[in-house]
Amino acid sequence: MKTPIEVKILDSRIGSQFPLPAYATPGSAGMDLRAMLETSIQVAPGETILIPTGISIHVADSSLAAVILPRSGLGHKHGIVLGNLVGLIDSDYQGPLMVSCWNRGSEPFTLEIGDRLAQLVFVPVVQAEFKLVDEFDNSSRGEGGFGHSGTK
């Protein structure tokens, strides 16, 4: 069963020239988001540009959130990743989805109208409440971190 999520189309080319984000395969975790630009743009090495996706969503369910993640091929082949590394969309956010596009590569990258730029993944959320303690119960790891377990 799929969870219904409200979506607004902010760019009329979505649904006519470009499809609404959807899962590419039955096993896909993410839906591709497109660069809904007015014209193609070149992203210089080291440059970060905010790109509209042409949609807004309202998750509405506080047990869910959406995350915007980079597409693996763009990052590996061209150095195109997210400027904020991960975009977190809270369940009560209703504004436009934007992608912070960062060229961490050494060559300029041209982004065309409608290019698939990032992916949208829905994840479960647990809202925690802190419980103040003076000491933690012992664990096998304790305070070990940052390389504590080695690489082999």
Swiss-Prot record:
<feature type="binding site">
    <location>
        <begin position="88"/>
        <end position="90"/>
    </location>
    <ligand>
        <name>substrate</name>
    </ligand>
</feature>
<dbReference type="GO" id="GO:0000287">
    <property type="term" value="F:magnesium ion binding"/>
</dbReference>
<feature type="binding site">
    <location>
        <begin position="71"/>
        <end position="73"/>
    </location>
    <ligand>
        <name>substrate</name>
    </ligand>
</feature>
<comment type="similarity">
    <text>Belongs to the dUTPase family.</text>
</comment>
<keyword id="KW-0546">Nucleotide metabolism</keyword>
<keyword id="KW-0479">Metal-binding</keyword>
<feature type="binding site">
    <location>
        <position position="84"/>
    </location>
    <ligand>
        <name>substrate</name>
    </ligand>
</feature>
<dbReference type="InterPro" id="IPR036157">
    <property type="entry name" value="dUTPase-like_sf"/>
</dbReference>
<dbReference type="InterPro" id="IPR029054">
    <property type="entry name" value="dUTPase-like"/>
</dbReference>
<dbReference type="Pfam" id="PF00692">
    <property type="entry name" value="dUTPase"/>
</dbReference>
<comment type="function">
    <text>This enzyme is involved in nucleotide metabolism: it produces dUMP, the immediate precursor of thymidine nucleotides and it decreases the intracellular concentration of dUTP so that uracil cannot be incorporated into DNA.</text>
</comment>
<dbReference type="GO" id="GO:0046081">
    <property type="term" value="P:dUTP catabolic process"/>
</dbReference>
<feature type="binding site">
    <location>
        <position position="98"/>
    </location>
    <ligand>
        <name>substrate</name>
    </ligand>
</feature>
<keyword id="KW-0378">Hydrolase</keyword>
<protein>
    <recommendedName>
        <fullName>Deoxyuridine 5'-triphosphate nucleotidohydrolase</fullName>
        <ecNumber>3.6.1.23</ecNumber>
    </recommendedName>
</protein>
<comment type="pathway">
    <text>Pyrimidine metabolism; dUMP biosynthesis; dUMP from dCTP (dUTP route): step 2/2.</text>
</comment>
<dbReference type="InterPro" id="IPR008181">
    <property type="entry name" value="dUTPase"/>
</dbReference>
<dbReference type="InterPro" id="IPR033704">
    <property type="entry name" value="dUTPase_trimeric"/>
</dbReference>
<dbReference type="GO" id="GO:0006226">
    <property type="term" value="P:dUMP biosynthetic process"/>
</dbReference>
<keyword id="KW-0460">Magnesium</keyword>
<dbReference type="GO" id="GO:0004170">
    <property type="term" value="F:dUTP diphosphatase activity"/>
</dbReference>
